[in-house]
């Protein structure tokens, strides 16, 4: 993790998708490690254990804290729906006294995004699920913005890390020939395509 961080240019914000959330003393150590020791600019946290598990992160007023609200995985329906995600959005709005809180809202639930926005008010959304999970980018952005132009961050992981999933290697030699340079080029192309797709949605 530390080696990866060292390769990131200083002007690029680093969000640790750590999903931390534990009893107060443990959360305090997690917050110190990720936000101070490693110097991440933001972190994702789980609200399931309540305010005292989140408070140590909130004390870092110059850091961004994204709270899991409605996640992009299919298991989100087990507990978060039908009402828990709305309670989270409302509660996080109360906790946002330093204006450094945001919500993690999956793009796989575009029909629920507007309800979250109504509960949360104008706080940033971190939106996963656009790539490999097949989230609805355009519908999600329409609901998130809703005429407010509130900032949101689109997260894509697997679709950029593994853009060549359709490539089938017949033997180890072929795998070697598909060099790291090819991987970087493919990932760069996938990121550019997503960036353009987002721009097109916002310009409509």
Task: State each model region's role.
Residues 14, 65, 103, 125, ...:
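Hydrophobic/aromatic residues located in beta-strands of well-ordered beta-sheets
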Residues 1-7, 23-27, 48-62, 108-118, ...:
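Active-site-adjacent beta->alpha loops and helix N-cap segments on the catalytic face
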Residues 2-10, 29, 33, 56, ...:
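Alpha-helical scaffolding segments of alpha/beta enzyme cores, especially the outer helices
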Residues 1, 5, 22-41, 139-143, ...:
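A short alpha/beta connector and helix-capping loop motif
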Residues 107-155, 159-166:
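A C-terminal functional module that forms or caps the active site or interfaces directly
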Residues 18, 22-104, 122:
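Conserved anion-binding
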Residues 140-147, 151, 162-204:
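C-terminal helical cap(s) of enzyme catalytic domains, especially alpha/beta-barrels
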Residues 1-16, 120, 125:
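Alpha-helix-loop-beta-strand connector modules within alpha/beta enzyme cores
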């Amino acid at each position: 993790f530390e080696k990866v961080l060292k390769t990131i240019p200083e002007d690029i914000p680093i969000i640790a998708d750590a999903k931390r959330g534990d009893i107060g003393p443990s959360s305090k150590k997690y917050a110190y490690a990720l936000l101070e020791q490693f110097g991440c600019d933001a972190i994702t946290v789980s609200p399931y254990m309540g305010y005292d598990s989140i408070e140590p992160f909130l004390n870092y007023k110059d850091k961004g804290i994204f709270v899991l609200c409605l996640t992009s995985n299919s298991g989100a329906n087990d507990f978060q729906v039908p009402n828990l995600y709305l309670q989270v959005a409302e509660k996080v709005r109360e906790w946002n006294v330093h204006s450094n809180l945001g919500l993690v809202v999956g793009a796989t639930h575009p029909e629920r995004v507007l309800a979250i926005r109504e509960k949360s008010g104008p706080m940033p959304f971190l939106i996963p699920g656009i790539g490999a999970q097949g989230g609805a980018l355009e519908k999600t952005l329409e609901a998130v913005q809703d005429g407010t132009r509130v900032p949101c961050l689109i997260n894509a992981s697997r679709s950029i890390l593994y853009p060549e999933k359709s490539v089938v290697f017949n033997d180890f030699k072929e795998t070697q020939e598909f060099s790291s340079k090819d991987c970087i080029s493919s990932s760069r192309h996938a990121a550019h395509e997503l960036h353009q797709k987002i721009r097109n949605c916002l310009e409509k």
